[in-house]
């Protein structure tokens, strides 16, 4: 019984270290969200830090409200992409846990 508990504690510690390492890797990964057929692009890290916003020069001076909507849509697209990449990367860390199919990680 003690051996099983000790083994479980070692596994938990190893997983914690693996998760920390993966979070550091995710911080370096950048994804790009787009809107308006690529006329507005937002680049952010998988820690949700926005690094760049690119707006096609043809949109400058156009309808301000439309431009604001496109920026918001590009940010939302980038957020969805971050979530997808994060889920894929964290799934490799959680692979040994035996979580039920479809369960998102981290919880």
From Swiss-Prot:
GO terms for cellular component: bacterial nucleoid; cytosol. It is found in: Cytoplasm, Nucleoid. Binds to DNA and alters its conformation. May be involved in regulation of gene expression, nucleoid organization and DNA protection. It holds the Pfam family YbaB_DNA_bd. Belongs to the YbaB/EbfC family. Homodimer. This is Nucleoid-associated protein NE0434. Keywords: Cytoplasm, DNA-binding. One of its GO terms (molecular function) is DNA binding.
